[in-house]
């Protein structure tokens, strides 16, 4: 065996040892840059353009509407004939607290109907939450086991859906409503839905 062949083996061994590390670092860099470049609020939904799920949810016990009457739960008819903003929320959800004042302002817009799906929450906590921030909802249903939210394709709370007059989902916002996405995305989507016949 020649001296050159003996020196070649340690070099080859070093390459074989370093190859997995180099591959790992390359893949890690690829994932980091690909995941970091996307906007998580723009997660596509297979439901866009499809009818809103048939949702029947009982109302939040003891929750009152602005007129002092019990706030109704959610029924399939809630998603037809009017532009409807459906917000999936919970009192234990920190970003839901952040978006609550903006959602309350949207609830003042008489051109749209704001409906809430209370996700895996306790009724007392939901009532306290809405007592603190104001109740923007024309209807609010209890989704105690999360099944109705799954039918809407919810990944986590909060999520907001815009349903057109035709009962079809026009837009989905993943994450909280913020001043930036309210002005840049949600309000234009609402105006587009209102303009549609």
What residues fall within each predicted segment?
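N-terminal targeting signals for export/organelle localization
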Residues: 1-62, 197
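A short beta-strand-turn-helix
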Residues: 55-84
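Short pre-active-site segment immediately N-terminal to redox-active cysteine/selenocysteine motifs
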Residues: 82-84, 88-92, 156
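Conserved segment of the thioredoxin-like fold in thiol-based oxidoreductases
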Residues: 108-145, 157
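Solvent-exposed loop/turn segments at secondary-structure junctions
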Residues: 90-94, 120-124, 146-148, 176-179
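Thiol/disulfide oxidoreductase modules built on the thioredoxin-like
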Residues: 131-136, 142-194
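Conserved redox-active cysteine motifs that mediate thiol-disulfide chemistry
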Residues: 88-105
